[in-house]
């Protein structure tokens, strides 16, 4: 199994506009639907396989997700979450249009293994000389990284990613980092069935990172 930080680090080796380039290049309507969802919310591939509900309410685009990695006995994960996204992004515009075509509601599904395979193939096609390939999890790590670099509250990040605890987000990017992806996540609001548990470990980690950033800037 890959180290949890490996995908985060690999984002730095992808083309700066990799999300836009991949999305533009896809001709298959079914795959384009799936990649639009990944670009918009960074859901897990297993959640995409279950089906993502796309709806328009009061002219706002909402994606409903049934969570993966959920265990009611241990309190792990969020069973369901709703995410309001920026519909001015290329994938936001696309999903808004698709939902309107389907009388304001539709469900998008794609096989978890299949979508990553298609993305790796597309990555090789677009960037044959790059060793780092785009996968479904690249989108999830991008959303987490961008939200952190944008200074979004830990609770909002946890809700977006489907975490029960705000400490789980520590493998996605770093607050106060390079800021290269600041403002690019497109998440307006996230709502979950269960409240997010706050971890004191996150406070300690954020304090440590703040000191490190300050020291490195001296």
Each model region followed by its residue ranges:
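C-terminal secondary-structure termini that scaffold catalytic or DNA-interacting sites
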Residues: 186-218
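Basic, Lys/Arg- and aromatic-enriched nucleic-acid-binding interface segment
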Residues: 12-45
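Active-site-proximal segment of tyrosine recombinases
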Residues: 48, 134, 144, 151-163
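DNA breakage-rejoining catalytic core of tyrosine-based enzymes
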Residues: 1-17, 72-87
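Conserved tyrosine-mediated DNA breakage-rejoining catalytic core shared by Y-recombinases
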Residues: 50-93
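Short, amphipathic alpha-helical "recognition" segments used to contact nucleic acids or chromatin
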Residues: 35, 141-149
């Amino acid at each position: 199994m890959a180290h949890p930080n490996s995908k985060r680090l690999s984002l730095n080796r992808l083309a700066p506009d990799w999300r836009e380039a991949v999305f533009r290049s896809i001709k298959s309507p079914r795959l384009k639907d799936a990649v639009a969802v990944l670009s918009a919310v960074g859901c897990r591939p297993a959640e995409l396989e279950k089906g993502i509900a796309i709806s328009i309410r009061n002219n706002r685009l909402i994606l409903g997700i049934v969570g993966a990695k959920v265990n009611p006995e241990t309190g792990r994960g969020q069973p369901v979450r709703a995410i309001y996204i920026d519909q001015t992004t290329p994938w936001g515009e696309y999903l808004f249009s698709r939902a309107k075509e389907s009388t304001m509601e539709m469900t998008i599904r794609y096989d978890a293994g299949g979508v990553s395979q298609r993305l790796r193939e597309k990555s090789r096609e677009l960037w044959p000389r790059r060793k780092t390939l785009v996968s479904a999890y690249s989108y999830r790590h991008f959303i987490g990284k961008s939200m952190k670099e944008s200074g979004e509250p830990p609770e909002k990040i946890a809700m977006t990613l489907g975490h029960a605890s705000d400490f789980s987000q520590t493998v996605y990017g770093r607050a106060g980092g390079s800021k290269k992806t600041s403002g690019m996540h497109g998440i307006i609001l996230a709502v979950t069935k269960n409240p997010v548990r706050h971890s004191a470990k996150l406070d300690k980690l954020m304090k440590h990172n703040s000191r490190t950033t300050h020291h490195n800037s001296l």
